């Protein structure tokens, strides 16, 4: 059995709240139970988790964001990959499927709808951040 946290690059996810909703994307190819998730992708050599979150958001959704703060890191319970989560603020653009090879949908999700998109729950620091930023 291989240790995926060292064999594969870390993944950085962007947590973007706008107008009381959080941006989620649906992967064209599911990763186990993982279908809807935050914009995310591999951290490239020489890149910080925050820089990767900003880059991946632009590549996947066409939305320009700025990193606000790193919320935390963990080994994802469903994928075994090392994940970093960065809170980001939108700067310009409109979220859309910009990379049709990777995504097939984007959605701005209200606080109460999150369990419908992520039924297995969120990483606690991400949930806490969303609880503070979004009306229940």
Report residues per predicted region.
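Conserved N-terminal beta-strand and adjoining loop/helix that marks the start
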Residues: 2-23, 42, 73
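Short beta-strand micro-motifs in enzyme catalytic cores
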Residues: 10, 34, 82-86
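Conserved hydrophobic "DFG−1" position in protein kinase catalytic cores
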Residues: 16-17, 24, 88-90, 108
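Nudix hydrolase/Nudix homology domain
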Residues: 31-36, 100-136
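Active-site-adjacent beta-strand/loop module that shapes the phosphate/pyrophosphate-binding cleft
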Residues: 74-96, 107, 122-129, 133
């Amino acid at each position: 059995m291989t240790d995926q946290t060292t064999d594969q690059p870390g993944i950085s996810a962007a947590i973007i709240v706008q107008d009381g909703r959080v941006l989620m994307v649906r992967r064209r190819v599911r990763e186990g139970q993982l279908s809807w998730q935050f914009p995310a992708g591999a951290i490239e050599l020489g890149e910080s988790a925050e820089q990767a979150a900003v880059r991946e958001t632009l590549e996947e959704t066409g939305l320009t964001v700025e990193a606000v703060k790193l919320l935390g890191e963990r080994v994802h319970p469903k994928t075994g990959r090392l994940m970093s989560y960065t809170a980001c603020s939108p700067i310009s653009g409109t979220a859309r499927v910009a990379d049709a090879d990777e995504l097939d949908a984007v959605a701005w999700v209200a606080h109460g709808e999150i369990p419908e998109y992520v039924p297995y729950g969120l990483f606690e620091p991400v949930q806490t951040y969303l609880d503070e930023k979004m009306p229940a």
